[in-house]
């Protein structure tokens, strides 16, 4: 394509509202246009990149037996009510809902488990059809509260979602392994740094779940890695540092602690390290329309993990109780909540099990207690893993080697759902004993826009976007000084030859100076620039510069051999001989 034909626009100035680099560069380089908050027009330049990304996804999914379909975007409320997710999603305010002319409620799809389950339940005729792997690449919707992150957190976004249906847990696991490998192949082809980590299933399901994270400084998520094992910090199981505690139980003491509320204040007041103090927080657990308040005690040097609490106690939601709720249920305020004399159900982290003679609050303002012990002073609560992993914690899954902590962006998520949705929609078959058997389901998704934005976050430099070669909008930009007739003639010939060989060149035929064109090419992120400047004018040698600033000087007769080595294989053409 020629620049004069391409409908695009670059900008010198960054959008002041852009909260992340990828949003700033996508707008600046002419890839997206903001229609409204969190809603974007994908420009022709963006769509070239997206189509290449989607081609890679389709190739890898088709290779393992995936069948593409298109599911509806409008979903009847009754389908979501069947699984209990209608109210769960609406309570978060993330679901777009509407009412039709017959006064029936619908939603704009954020995900498609209900719709695909209903479809398969009507078409599945027998066990011989299993396993089934269906996928789509479609627009989805979430009413994000603060959509300031461009494609990272848009209200309307492009996503690939796969659904598998199997005759047994074993077959479901086989499908999971196939999809996991296919997703690995997709991200390997992008040549970006990513990790696969254990994750919490959230509202989707509670079976085996993993996330794919692109490593970048944006740090929307924190991930813990030890050797080949990784986990989202919300799901990471870790062994924190261990301490020795007194064997002899000392007499309990009540101590006046006026306005001593924080861990730092307690350490100073008692002249003790935080690991000898127990802190307690109250959380509100939601079960459908019912709420329950429980207290969670944890060692003073650690942070609480709301995701683990929600999972352990099988709640739909878990949040910290508000100041008003603390007064209502405990009659006290932050800083003075404790396991001693606790009027609500109490749980404690495993790290507190061996603690003796510890400091804690007793749910009375301006008072703490010293030399408190389990059993003698407080009945032992139910223990669990409620802590947030930290760098340096030991990883049980990797022989107790320490964790390293990285920042990343989640770009894909894979789940084993079991029979949660298939039971609701009676997706099943008759087994050999002619008994009705429920199918086992998996769900998988790649955020197309998020992946493209994450590539920018990881690879961009001070000159602009750096696309992976596999998805760049063009293979090479052909640049020359506007008004230089000889260079223009050579550029036109190279441009046509590249097209004939199946490559995707961009010929910048604008009547602009070379420096201007170079800056635009770098901003857009084209992997290579063929520069017809002074070197070409003086010696006839082609100057090529990669986006990573590596330079090549190539004789025109050798240029297409160079292309064969440095470009992706031409699409739809035989390799260059």
Curated annotation (Swiss-Prot):
Tell me the Pfam families matching this sequence. HGTP_anticodon (PF03129), tRNA-synt_2b (PF00587), tRNA_edit (PF04073)
Which family does the UniProt entry place this protein in?
Belongs to the class-II aminoacyl-tRNA synthetase family. ProS type 1 subfamily.
Q: Does the keyword Cytoplasm apply?
A: yes
What the entry says about domains is:
Consists of three domains: the N-terminal catalytic domain, the editing domain and the C-terminal anticodon-binding domain.
According to its UniProt entry, what is the function of this protein?
A: Catalyzes the attachment of proline to tRNA(Pro) in a two-step reaction: proline is first activated by ATP to form Pro-AMP and then transferred to the acceptor end of tRNA(Pro). As ProRS can inadvertently accommodate and process non-cognate amino acids such as alanine and cysteine, to avoid such errors it has two additional distinct editing activities against alanine. One activity is designated as 'pretransfer' editing and involves the tRNA(Pro)-independent hydrolysis of activated Ala-AMP.
Q: Which gene encodes it?
A: proS
Assembly and binders? Homodimer.
Swiss-Prot/TrEMBL catalytic activity: tRNA(Pro) + L-proline + ATP = L-prolyl-tRNA(Pro) + AMP + diphosphate
Location(s), subcellular: Cytoplasm
GO terms assigned for molecular function: aminoacyl-tRNA deacylase activity; ATP binding; proline-tRNA ligase activity
Q: Which UniProt keywords apply?
A: Aminoacyl-tRNA synthetase, ATP-binding, Cytoplasm, Ligase, Nucleotide-binding, Protein biosynthesis
In terms of superkingdom, the source organism counts as: Bacteria
Which InterPro entries does UniProt cross-reference here?
A: aa-tRNA-synt_IIb (IPR002314), aa-tRNA-synth_II (IPR006195), aa-tRNA-synth_II/BPL/LPL (IPR045864), Anticodon-bd (IPR004154), Anticodon-bd_dom_sf (IPR036621), Pro-tRNA-ligase_IIa (IPR002316), Pro-tRNA-synth_IIa_bac-type (IPR004500), Pro-tRNA-Synthase_IIa_type1 (IPR023717)
**Gene Ontology CC terms:** cytosol
Primary localisation category? cytoplasm
**What is the recorded name of this protein?**
Proline--tRNA ligase
Its taxonomic placement starts with: Bacteria, Pseudomonadati, Chlamydiota, Chlamydiia, Chlamydiales
Q: What EC number(s) does this enzyme carry?
A: 6.1.1.15
Q: State the Gene3D superfamilies in the record.
A: Anticodon-binding domain (3.40.50.800), Bira Bifunctional Protein, Domain 2 (3.30.930.10), YbaK/aminoacyl-tRNA synthetase-associated domain (3.90.960.10)
Q: Name one GO biological process term.
A: prolyl-tRNA aminoacylation
